[in-house]
Amino acid sequence: VANDKIIIHGARAHNLKNIDVKIPKNKLVVITGLSGSGKSSLAFDTLYAEGQRRYVESLSAYARQFLGQMDKPDVDSIDGLSPAISIDQKTTSHNPRSTVGTVTEINDFLRLLWARVGTPICPNDHIPISSQSPDQMVDRVLELSERTRLQILSPVVRDKRGIQKKVFEKIKKEGFVRVQVDGETYELDEVPELDKNKKHTVNVVIDRIIIKDGIRSRLFDSFEAALRLSDGYAIADVIGGDSIPFSEKYACTICGFTVGELEPRLFSFNAPIGACPECEGLGSKLEVDVDLVVPDRTKTLREGAMIPWNPISSQYYPQLLEQFCEAAGINMDTPFNKLSKKQQQQVLYGNGDQTFHFHYENDFGGVRDVDVPFEGVINNIKRRYKETNSDFTREQMRKYMTELPCPACHGYRLNQRVLAVKINGQNIGEVSELPISKAITFFEGVQFSEQQEKIARPILKEILDRLTFMKNVGVEYLTLSRSARTLSGGEAQRIRLATQIGSNLSGVMYVLDEPSIGLHQRDNDRLISSLKAMRDLGNTLIVVEHDEDTMRAADYIVDIGPGAGANGGKVMAAGTPKQIMRSRKSLTGQYLSGKKMIEVPKERREGNGKHIILKGAAENNLKNINVDFPLGKFICVTGVSGSGKSTLVNVILKRILAQKLNNNSAKPGKYKSISGIRNIEKVINIDQSPIGRTPRSNPATYTGVFDDIRELFAQTNQAKMRGYNKGRFSFNVKGGRCEACHGDGIIKIEMNFLPDVYVPCEVCHGTRYNSETLEVEYKGKNISQVLNMTVSEALKFFSAIPKIKRKLQTIEDVGLGYVTLGQPATTLSGGEAQRMKLAAELHRQSRGKSFYILDEPTTGLHMDDIKRLLAVLQRLVDAGNTVLVIEHDLDVVKSADWLIDLGPEGGEAGGYIVATGTPEEVAKVKESYTGQYLKKMLERDKAL
């Protein structure tokens, strides 16, 4: 049947070579191949793009204009396509209001649960707050034994100062005769004069009643009168016994604290009715951080201790500070920490209303001569952040601010009314702070009355299902209140995956981009089971993946190759994992069958004997640990997801080194001390962010080789005769570039209701340069033709020019020989951008004292790419540098000289050092999950 396959004919997106592919439906299909071979072009730019486009095309033109345009992918035909949903690596929302709970929609169910079965508890008197109708009040009183005497009271004044004259007049008008004032009963005419400075309580006596048959309607009328007078409150005061307070609103019967009608939107921190008024539902407030304003307190004011006021473009603030200090008698040559407390406060927070004389002349002759109060550096930053219209200034001021938990709601984001509503003693904010594993325990053990149970059961099922899906994809250490913008790409993707599993759709084609990123081997098995569960609902899963376990678990594998870029784009093999392993053409198959492998290094380096020692690391979940980083080695930090690796390396170590060596202002996480920094000269973070934000940035400009190439062109005889310098060969400045397209080579034409069309510039035909510039040639090629060469081609072409050859060789060495010199930076994948940065580092003349940090460098890399990456990293270490990677990939882990394994679990149960040492030593540690998997791998490698 043709219906059980997706059949692609003639796919040509990017580097795909007009390929035909058949993919079985309702199966777990892995698309694999080298980085840059065309996997994403097939999965995302062909299959997903066409599935999405067909859906959008079926909508009206009016609806389409809101959905953004979908280009038709370059493919002849695709048959058997289902509606497509893509779950990719783009981190979710950057909106501070977006949390794990809102992204997964669990918050909607929590709000419903608390609104329907939550009990409000007064925060002042700690008694349950409920609301009763007059009928319920009558029923409660009729439960008292017969002949009980009581009076129905209406509390009109509670604990208020004043003589309450108007209140008594109103009561008299209503026709009542008795009142209770501060516990004593009086006739209205005999009430003594009240002390206006004391607090008083006034209750109107509505009726005096003895419980007997036939009293119901009289009681009902009395309660109605009481509720009307006091705006919703009544008291049944048993003579010689207790009094029973009633309220028809959700309000405390003692202090009047009101919660109001419980409805789901009340529990949303994104609705004004529920949000904390202080922080407007953000849970944190931006405050100026003294440590960022004065990072080094041993400096004097004259040496620039106040970072924000150091001279940049004008001397205004330095002059202001100097003249204030003179007036206030503060010595600018005393280290800041040696100034008195009062003087430090004056500089930071100002001098109140006291004025001093300030004289200032700017560079343009403008003079300011005034008596002004001194507002203080911190108040100045606050004011400028609030008042400025300039984004630049706001961004500058933001650098000195830190988000602190809101003092009013303690970071729960909700107002006091909402936080008063509890289930099993917990409010919605407290439950959102629990790690998902603990939240599951809470909801499984929650106790309800019989009636509540009926209401809560369906809501609880939805909540527990969704929480369990999140546990199954390996993020049980996250909390629902965690801000979505602090999640890593892998976490964000797995959360969206859990949401999709929760939506229970079937007949959909899901396209996933490396869901195993950032997952430890241990958590991988659960992820694979989740993927299979989605498949079993009747969905097709197309997963772009390099992970060996996922490939072995797949129903079908498509291997794209043989190389990358222009050398890729063909189907090398397609079939079940067993068929792929037998294929001679498939590189992936050779690694899966063990014909090819990444060798374990023959020996582990001893290092240079020096260390960086970090003591008392305690940010997030780190348990006050001491970590020793031996220098001159290849170090790998491992541990299950959420064990604290990123906190240790990115939030603490990297920021300390960047602050001390690069004058960076990002504030490191909590730690006690660090030693050994003098043993390194610079810290270099090589991440997967793009090497340039615009299409004008490309590998040639980024690695600096383009400067050398332009220099070379300017040295040619033709260029010398015409008087061209190297600026003539730049497509970014006037002179040599084509002015019709400003050196872009393409022109964007906007079309309404249709996708924007990019056409080659008709003046320069996409070459970016004007015809005069293109007449200058080196070895028969002009500058535009050189930009269109791949790195491998250029390497042969410039083999006689050592300076150019060296830079190109390093790009070739990191496995990017297939990239063209002029390829726009925006089209490089994260893995390619990271390796481009490595290449740029490799050709810098290193003095062997650099400290490189890489966070999961194997993202997007095939086993064969990893082999190359490792060779490059080992070269950096051989030159005497230190390389520190955070990594789960066992091929990288087994190749390191030194491992630091954190754990044992993720979240609260993590943050300890489980093992350190060489891979062989860590493999012997039974408590280490990494060690267990490493042991299997090292044994398997020996067997092969």
Predicted regions located by residue number:
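Conserved phosphate-binding elements of NTP-dependent enzyme cores
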Residues: 1-944
